[in-house]
Amino acid sequence: MTKEEKLARKQQRKAEKVGLGKLLLWNSSSCSVALSTLMLGYATFYCTDVLQLAPALVGTLFMVSKIFDSFTDIVAGFIVDRTQTRWGKGRPYEIFMLFLWLSTWLLFSCPTSFATAAKCIWIFCMYTFMNSICVTFLNANNVVYMVRAFENKEQQSKIVGYGSIFTMAGAMVFNVLFPTAMAKVGTDAVGMIAIPLTAIGMLRILTIPEKFTPVSEKNGEQTHLKDLLPLLKESRPVLIICMVRFVQNIATGLGVGTYYWQYIIGNLGMMGVASVTTILVLPLAFALPVLRKKFGMAGMSVIGILVGCIGYLAT
């Protein structure tokens, strides 16, 4: 290898490098959003056991909210795509992090003295604003922000790949601590973690600017709704992905794990203790790139589904 080739390779590695500090700062927002989403798993339990609302009524409220969410996803994407500010295109929407945790705290702070109708209005408004507005915009801006903060695909791949490890670690810590805190101090646990997680979630908007313009934007390319409709109609893989996400949202939104530990096991605090075992999965995250090369994404998906089914059947 010539001296010029060595220099070129060194410069390439330098261009592809993402420092640990920037990696943590970027994923601070994603981790905060993920933890707020995990907290929604306790919303059904809170509504039925604390507010004494009928399970069928709670399910109906959440179902209507999810239907509304399907429309806000489309609207948020088009709003973000057409944004032009001095802070950039995707970065300004990180401000929804403040409203996300405010609405999360309010969701679990409904006065128990309210009448049933008032409780329903409170829960529906807070749940919808949190999930259908705040989380939607924080998801819609994510890729738009990333491609303007990191210029090359190698950096973007590292941000997504290694960043998921930090998000997974944060979720594990949450799953261990939050059920125990809920068992001891009730819904006050939400307020205890809302402030620090808001601060963590705001690190990205305060430290990482948008510095680059994607090629598609330089060429003046824009996505229109009429371009998406034929894709949904003719592309079978897209329809399959939509169905998978639909089933996934139903399964994750049930929140049955809380009921299982409270009424079958008899101790909600033990849910956090049992979650300690999930730390065994963390080293596997470092092996995912190798496994993905060996089995492919389809093979990895099948393996994950089979392992998940075995786990659910065993419990």
Question: Predicted segment positions?
Answer:
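Membrane-embedded alpha-helical bundles of multi-pass transporters/translocases
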Residues: 7-221, 225-315
